[in-house]
Every structure is written in C-alpha cells, then in structure tokens.
C-alpha cells in the first residue's frame, strides 16, 4: 500500500457519478490524525463539494484496528518540548495553534458538508477520530467499534466539538463520559446519538457496492441523501449490535453527576464502589486523570449548553492552545505516550485543590476577536 498519509479514490456509480473515498493511511499509529492528513482531507473535500459528478463521500481508516485513534499528540508534544523546556513556563505553541485551527476547521466542514458524507467507524474511534466522525451524514458503527474521549488522561479535555455535542445527550451523560473517558460500543453510540447505523464489519464491501448501484435521481441534495439512505437500508442490522453499557446504568450515572459542581461530581464517582466492570474501569480512569482537566470538562459543557457549534470550536481553540502553553498537557502525554511510566505529575493533587484562577487563566484568549483564527467559522462557504 502507498505510504501517502491519506489515500483518495473515486468509485464509478451506475448513474454515471462517482463516490469519493478517503482513507486515513497510518495504520501503525492507529491512523493518528496528523496536520498533513488534515490539510489533505480538507482540500479534497472542498474539491469534491463542487464536483457535480461526486454524489457522496466515504471516509475510513486503513488496517483492521482503528478508524482513527485521535490527534497526533506526540507530534504536538515534541514541538512543545523543543520550543519551551519547562512545564508551565508559557511554551511556544505555534504548531498547536496551526494544528488545532486546521483540525477544528475540518471538523466543522464535515458537520456542514453539502453532500452525504459517510464515516466507517470501525475499530477505535477516539479523540480526533471522533471529531471526524461526529459530523458525518451517516455514521456507521460495527461490532468492533470502540468510541471514547479519553483526553482527561493526558491533561486535555474533550474538544473536537464535544463541548457542543456532549450537551445533546441525556442530562449528565456527556459530563460523565468526559470525566471518565468511558469507552463506548456500537450500541452505546446508537443510543446516545453518536452513530446512525450498525452494519457488521464483513459487509463493508457490500455496502460500497450498493452505494455504487444506488439511484441518485436529479443529484439534488435531497436525491443524493435518499440514494445513500436506500443503499444503507439494505445492510443495516441494528438488532445484532452488542448490548449497551450506558443505558443500563443511566440512572446511576445521572445520580453521580447531577446538580453538582466538578469537584463534587469527581468525589462522588471516586467514592462509588461499582461491581460492574465498565463502571469500575471508568472510575479508575478518572482516579488517574488530570484534576485540572476535570474542571475544564465541566466548564466547557456549562459554557456551551446553548451556543452554536462554531462558537464551541472557537472557544475550544483558545482552551486547547492554552492547555499546551500552560496546562498539564505536556506532562500527560509524557507519562502516557513518551516515557510510558503512567505516573503523571499533575499540577494539582485532586479536583478539590484546583483554584478557580487556574481554570480561568486557561480561558484567556491569546487573540482579540478580530484576530481569532476561527473568527469566520460558520459565516461563509469555507467555514460551512
């Protein structure tokens, strides 16, 4: 297979059109999303959007383990540690600014894409991978799907638009997922509105064949969507999806995080002694996670309960860059992915010890509103 970071193909359809296929091509890193991948994807999506022969787009990952396991945080770590040695010293964040700006712009583009865009969410779909998947017209999950937003383990928070879409879940569920980095299966994704259809992995080639044979009518937006839906209808098997993990525990989850502040929610989860293995794993992940991140999870969900998706991305860009400059992100990545000692030295011992000023400082924008890199997001064609 080619060593290009993203592979592009166009499948001819029976109606004389073509289906654009984009494949993330870094299986050794579980298709971790690099800046080069982001640039190539957006450029091709822009071209396909105005190419009348393209009737639909299919996005997938290479290999059999992951669609995309997240953003390329190792590259970010290396740039930050090369540009500013001391933790919390105000690192030079040029790559971070460039990367997050491009990533969020691409994610927003997918949310607002004018043609039906399908995401084959097979295997691991985490962090930046979920950012690519969340805005798809049809988000397809399989028996191997594992979705999570585990940013609390590296001193970050659920970004990639999660500040907006986690708020669209049942009360408390988004906060719980963000605090614990809980892993979700296909049924959970369907139950929580993070996926649209369950299709067994073995049917991938059959689904693509059905899409090439579909009727796309007059190629209006409605006709393109109808053609895709009809093709997918033939292969959906929702009844065979694995049993969910969230819905059986939703009352318990809501009792843990409902009507409280971040330190109280964290304390309740850590004091819980669940017999269920999934709940216990979530508790353990929070116990090892970044205390400052717990506050960021909570604060971002509060700030974006009623805002637009574009506003959420703008706020996330500020927070993500500041986490790289001043927060625990570098230490979290070091402990988990570089030295792999899994013993991060967080800035604060627990959530109750995090002062309000430490949280507020990370929300101070390094740009004026006129200089914000995503100031035009949502206002024109390029931003969706």
Which residues does each PLM region occupy?
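Amphipathic alpha-helical blocks and their helix-capping loop/short-beta junctions
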Residues: 200-286
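Glycine- (often His-adjacent) and acidic-residue-rich active-site loop
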Residues: 61-102, 155
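Glycine-rich beta-to-alpha active-site loop
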Residues: 110-154, 177, 181-182, 186
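Gly/Pro- and small hydrophobic-enriched strand-loop and loop-to-helix capping segments
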Residues: 136-159, 193-208
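Contiguous mid-protein beta-loop-alpha structural module that forms a pocket-lining wall or clamp
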Residues: 161-163, 168-224
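Conserved CoA-thioester-binding segment of acyl-CoA-metabolizing enzymes
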Residues: 1-60, 378-384
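Hydrophobic/aromatic residues within transmembrane alpha-helices
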Residues: 59, 72, 132-133, 188-189, ...
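Long, low-complexity C-terminal extensions of enzymes
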Residues: 265-281, 286-384
């Amino acid at each position: 297979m080619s060593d290009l970071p993203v592979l592009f193909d166009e499948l001819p359809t029976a109606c004389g059109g073509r289906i654009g296929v984009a494949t993330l091509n870094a299986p050794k890193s579980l298709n971790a999303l690099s800046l080069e991948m982001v640039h190539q994807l957006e450029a091709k999506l822009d071209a396909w959007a105005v190419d009348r022969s393209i009737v639909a787009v299919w996005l997938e990952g290479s290999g059999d383990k992951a669609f995309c396991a997240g953003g390329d945080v190792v590259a970010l770590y290396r740039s930050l540690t090369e540009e500013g040695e001391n933790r919390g010293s105000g690192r030079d964040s040029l790559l971070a600014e460039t990367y997050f700006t491009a990533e969020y712009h691409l994610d927003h583009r997918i949310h607002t894409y004018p043609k039906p865009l399908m995401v084959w969410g097979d295997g691991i779909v985490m962090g930046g991978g979920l950012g690519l998947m969340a805005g798809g017209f049809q988000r397809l999950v399989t028996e191997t799907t594992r979705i999570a937003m585990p940013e609390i383990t590296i001193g970050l928070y659920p970004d990639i638009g999660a500040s907006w879409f986690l708020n669209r879940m049942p009360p408390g569920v988004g906060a719980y997922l963000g605090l614990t980095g809980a892993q979700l299966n296909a049924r959970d994704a369907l139950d929580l509105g993070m996926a649209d259809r369950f299709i067994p992995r073995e049917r991938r080639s059959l689904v693509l064949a059905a899409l090439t044979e579909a009727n796309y009518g007059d190629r209006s937006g409605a006709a393109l969507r109808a053609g895709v839906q009809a093709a997918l209808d033939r292969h959906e098997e929702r009844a065979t999806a694995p049993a969910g993990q969230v819905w059986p525990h939703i009352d318990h989850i809501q009792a843990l995080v409902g009507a409280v502040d971040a330190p109280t929610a964290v304390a309740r989860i850590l004091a819980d002694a669940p017999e269920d293995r999934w709940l216990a794993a979530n508790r353990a992940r929070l116990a090892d996670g970044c205390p400052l991140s717990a506050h960021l999870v909570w604060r971002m969900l509060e700030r974006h309960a009623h805002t637009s998706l574009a506003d959420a991305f703008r706020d996330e860009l500020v927070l993500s860059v500041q986490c790289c400059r001043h927060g625990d992100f570098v230490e979290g990545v070091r402990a988990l992915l570089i030295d792999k000692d899994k013993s991060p030295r967080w800035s604060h011992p627990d959530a109750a010890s995090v002062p309000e000023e430490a949280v507020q400082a990370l929300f101070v924008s390094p740009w004026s509103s006129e200089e914000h890199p995503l100031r035009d997001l949502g206002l024109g064609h390029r931003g969706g």
